[in-house]
């Protein structure tokens, strides 16, 4: 029965792990719901500020903010939003694959790369993979604040205004639903023109201070809000991916326990049969 004892020990160990993964799944569900609420709360601000920027740009067409001016790209910047913790399936791996693909496409065209990394997993990846990381921040927690991001974002925006980079993009996971998280690379500056239905029926406004000053201030706030939105959405995607990963781990543990229980029962049955055979054989000899 030595084999049976080992199997019993293994079953007990897997059951213990199953309890942990089940608890982690429940925690991830709770955190994901809170992250979804933060994501939904921050989205209207980012959308509205873009509309206001559109109105301001129309009100002052002779002035073009540097964030609106396209120029030849010799050096590109990326703000990479990753997670601080693992156990979330292929979330970070898929993100890095999408990023590396985009970086390689740029490098083939002779474009150099600067990186701002948010999250411990991103920092670890670029320590191994290599890359010119000019700013990094991690351990933002479950409820990140936009104030925590301002310093790192400013490094990249200053680089753009000084002409050290010619394009800035944010790389993060989009929360599609609880089952789907999509890695995306989105251009932040220069601002990509998008058709805005609200601007087709706009009114004339009086601006205080003037439209140019407001536009200068709002442009920076807009980029900060977009990065914050990416961080919040990536957090929701992380919790969803962790929930799925822990559910799969719990289910796999259950399947493994069933298999081991069957093996244990067969081993025990074989041992009992052997004992009976020995007893019967001994009685016959007598």
UniProtKB/Swiss-Prot annotation:
Protein name: ATP synthase gamma chain
Family to which this protein belongs: Belongs to the ATPase gamma chain family.
Cellular component GO terms held in the UniProt record: plasma membrane; proton-transporting ATP synthase complex
Function comment: Produces ATP from ADP in the presence of a proton gradient across the membrane. The gamma chain is believed to be important in regulating ATPase activity and the flow of protons through the CF(0) complex.
Compartment annotation: Cell inner membrane
Quaternary assembly: F-type ATPases have 2 components, CF(1) - the catalytic core - and CF(0) - the membrane proton channel. CF(1) has five subunits: alpha(3), beta(3), gamma(1), delta(1), epsilon(1). CF(0) has three main subunits: a, b and c.
Record has Transport as a keyword: yes
Molecular function GO labels: ATP binding; proton-transporting ATP synthase activity, rotational mechanism
Annotated NCBIfam families: ATPsyn_F1gamma, PRK05621.1-1
Membrane topology: Peripheral membrane protein
Database matches in HAMAP family: ATP_synth_gamma_bact (MF_00815)
Keyword Phosphoprotein included in the entry's annotation: no
Species this chain originates from: Pseudomonas putida (strain GB-1)
GO-annotated biological processes: proton motive force-driven plasma membrane ATP synthesis
Main localisation: membrane
């Amino acid at each position: 029965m030595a084999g049976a004892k080992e199997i019993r020990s293994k079953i007990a160990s897997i059951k213990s792990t199953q309890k942990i993964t089940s608890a982690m799944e429940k925690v991830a569900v709770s955190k994901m719901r809170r992250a979804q609420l933060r994501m939904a709360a921050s989205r209207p601000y980012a959308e509205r500020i873009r509309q206001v920027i559109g109105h301001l740009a129309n009100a002052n067409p002779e002035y073009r903010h540097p964030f609106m001016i396209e120029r030849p790209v010799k050096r590109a910047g990326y703000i990479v939003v990753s997670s601080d913790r693992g156990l979330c399936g292929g979330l970070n791996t898929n993100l890095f694959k999408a990023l590396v693909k985009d970086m390689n496409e740029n490098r083939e065209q002779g474009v150099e790369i600067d990186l701002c990394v948010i999250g411990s997993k991103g920092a670890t990846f670029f320590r191994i993979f290599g890359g010119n990381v000019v700013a990094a921040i991690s351990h933002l927690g479950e409820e990140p604040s936009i104030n925590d991001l301002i310093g790192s974002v400013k490094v990249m925006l200053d680089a753009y205004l000084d002409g050290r980079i010619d394009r800035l993009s944010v790389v993060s996971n989009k929360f599609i639903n609880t089952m789907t998280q999509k890695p995306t690379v989105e251009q932040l500056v220069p601002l990509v023109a998008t058709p805005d239905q609200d601007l087709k029926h706009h009114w004339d406004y009086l601006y205080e201070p003037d439209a140019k000053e407001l536009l200068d201030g709002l442009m920076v706030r807009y980029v900060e809000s977009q990065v914050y939105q990416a961080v919040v959405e990536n957090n929701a995607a992380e919790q969803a991916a962790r929930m799925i990963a822990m559910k799969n781990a719990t289910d796999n543990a259950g399947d493994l326990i069933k298999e081991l229980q069957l093996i244990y029962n067969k081993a025990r049955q074989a041992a009992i049969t052997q004992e009976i055979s020995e007893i019967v054989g001994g009685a016959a000899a007598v």
